Amino acid sequence: MKRKELHETSRLAYGRRMTTRPAHIAMFSIALHGHVNPSLEVIRELVARGHRVTYAIPRLLADKVAEAGAEPKLWNSTLPGPDADPEAWGSTLLDNVEPFLADAIQSLPQLAQAYEGDEPDLVLHDIASYTARVLGRRWEVPVISLSPCMVAWEGYEQEVGEPMWEEPRKTERGQAYYARFHAWLEENGITDHPDPFIGRPDRSLVLIPKALQPHADRVDETTYTFVGACQGDRTAEGDWARPEGAEKVVLVSLGSAFTKQPAFYRECVRAFGELPGWHTVLQVGRHVDPAELGDVPDNVEVRTWVPQLAILQQADLFVTHAGAGGSQEGLATATPMIAVPQAADQFGNADMLQGLGVARTLPTEEATAKALRTAALALVDDPEVAARLKEIQARMAQEAGTRGPADLIEAELAAARG
């Protein structure tokens, strides 16, 4: 039986038993908004269906998952938190990956103890939670990855992974990283190589629009199911009113992590503050003092944090770091984008957005006031850009929703229960 048919048959069978057999589902994530927010509506839907959902999360974001109806299982993380200085993440590949392994190793005994005698029927996990996969193997229950960003396609390792790791693997530090990872897995009875252990889940729900996935035609859809952005009611984040007389509104945001860019923000003030009829909302984060921006004209609104989706629903342009969340919100609201990627998957997202014909990409060092203004004026009045955005927006509306992911999770539960 094909996986699609299995899902449908199992879902219907499971639905008949749900009234007497609710499941315990355990979700695992790290304390970063971009890793927690994308799946919250899926959690909310599972709770609404009668499942008990526990959520392994550091205290910093425990209230957020509790609001979705999950029971927080608290643990102490060694990773930089959501308000940490971006420089805490380092600047090299090994700087970026070593903290995740160290955190996984120290969190495993905490989480094993937290779930002792309360083992779940199924494990859900963010891609950064290596511990969840180890525990899922130990408990012999289904494990499903919830990916908030692009996933590996057939050929990814040869085209991206191996070239990226070629030099770090040769170093003593790189070899020590892999030796430590291998040893930790082997201690837990796992013989997988670390790379596929992290990057090749047995089952994954991809929480981005298929339009943002590179080489989507080469993604194994027996493993990965694209369910689109699962956006729920965001009114709790606050509202925003477009100023009267504003002919164009531009939102500038580099997300929640890599926001320490005062020089870039000054270029944005120069780029858009001098445009007649334009109003700019500039989110600078917690690590930039607005005084560092110098003289700011009245048509530039400087904020530490903004209700992003509420503004995008009224904006004419989005200057973004091209994180997965921001990219799909730009597409969902049909807002042209200038992508200024800062780290990780943002460079790939920026390439995808530009390839779709709905964005221009500027490296941070090239994002001068002149370059930003030129890109902005070219994008906002281009009818072809607007038409492409409307087409993608319509496709996304068909993908989106929380019932689909919940149905698929229930299908995996039913298949495991036989």
From Swiss-Prot:
A Pfam family reported for this protein in Swiss-Prot or TrEMBL: UDPGT
Keyword terms: Antibiotic resistance, Glycosyltransferase, Transferase
One MF annotation (Gene Ontology) recorded for this entry: hexosyltransferase activity
GO biological process per UniProt: antibiotic biosynthetic process; response to antibiotic
UniProt superkingdom: Bacteria
Enzyme class: transferase
EC nos: 2.4.1.-
Function: Specifically inactivates macrolides via 2'-O-glycosylation using UDP-glucose.
Family per record: Belongs to the UDP-glycosyltransferase family.
Name of the featured protein: Macrolide glycosyltransferase
Source organism of this protein record: Streptomyces lividans
Gene (UniProt): mgt
